[in-house]
């Protein structure tokens, strides 16, 4: 309504909302990150999806994790069980097992992308089960997983931004 030519939304959970707004302003163009426009309700013609190969980034994290693990157990903390998060985790587990077939991979979801204490608790549980590498795919919440890893002197791997400021055990 304000006359913008292009609007960009970010996040799988914004898909249906973006499609609904796009229908109301058909002269504006929309792009949404982490969503295939073909899967949107009503398939509005003024919306394009921007997809990434999350599994490939996850694969690199899996190779790094399997390489540095001394216990033979690595883990991942997802925010929610949604396609982009699951793609990161699938790549992580697949490539870790390709490199070291006997490696144990643990995974759990915090059900949150914001509350750091939830991801910290999930990560601490995984560390308690022997994980010495924690891969977080949980947005702001995941910083809690990285903090848990740093406080426990195990490796932490993050996504989306540089998280090295959280400790020296970051990959």
Q: Positions of the model-derived regions?
A:
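A residue-level marker of the well-folded mature domains of exported/periplasmic proteins
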Residues: 1-171
